[in-house]
Every structure is written in structure tokens, then in C-alpha cells.
Amino acid sequence: MHKFTKALAAIGLAAIMSQSAIAESMKLGFLVKQPEEPWFQTEWKFADKAGKDLGFEVIKIAVPDGEKTLNAIDSLAASGAKGFVICTPDPKLGPAIMAKARGYDMKVIAVDDQFANAKGKPMDTVPLVMMAATKIGERQGQELYKIGRAHV
């Protein structure tokens, strides 16, 4: 399910680009905070597949901290990327990420971690793709409770 969600994020980013921007050489970034983790390796794998299927190049960059995140956006812009998907190392970087992206006229989709503004409030205007982990946990708890009650 989560692999599918990540592929949808990449597809969504491609879809929000203008038709004239969608070309054989279109580039989109995929920035992740922990590239050594199998979870993110899988995300990159499916982003590459979406890129191959839809005709865009995925530029994968590790962004373990704020400085590397902002530098990565500069690098993406220099390479001609039209936008990026990001799992930020720190949600409080949201305003800086968005300011830098706007400066380059790049589209952004946040993944997993919702950006927060200076007051710590969610930045609801930034597209977000994530799992409903809380709801999944609640459902698991309910099912475990039922199993436990059945054995009492």
C-alpha cells in the first residue's frame, strides 16, 4: 500500500506540471531523509518505475539535515527539475523549503511528514501524501482487543 502511495506522489507531481513542461527530458526530484533505509530504497525504486512509465527522470538526493535539504533544492533547480517530492528531515523546514522552491518556480509534494510553519502549525497548502498510521494503529488495537476478549 505504501509503495503505491509513493508512486502516486510521483505521478501527482508529474500531473500538476503544465502539458508543455511534460517532455522527454522532464526531471523531478525525490528527496529523502534516510536513503540507507530499505523503506526509502523501495520508494525510490517505485519512483524510478513511475518515471520510466510516464517519461520523466527521477533525481534522487539524500537530505539528512536542513543544510543538505536547501542545497539539494538548488541542485535540482540547476539541473532543470520542475519540482520534487520530499520526506523532510525536519517538518519545521517547511517555510524555508517552500520559499526556496517558489524562488525557482518548482512544485512540491511533502511525503510522510507534513511541513509546519514558524508557529508549529501544519502547512495545509502544501500537498501531502502519507499513510494514516494513527488509524492503522487504532484498528490494530481494536482487533487485538477482540482477540484478547475472545480468550477470556
Regions found by a protein language model. Name each.
Residues 1-9:
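Bacterial N-terminal signal peptides that target proteins for export
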Residues 10-11, 21:
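Cleavable N-terminal signal peptides
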Residues 16-23:
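Sec/Tat signal peptide C-region and signal peptidase I cleavage site
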Residues 27-54, 58-71, 75, 79-81, ...:
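Extracytoplasmic "Venus flytrap"
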Residues 72, 96-100:
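A short acidic, amphipathic alpha-helical/loop segment
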Residues 85-88, 104-120:
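Short beta-strand elements of ligand-binding domains
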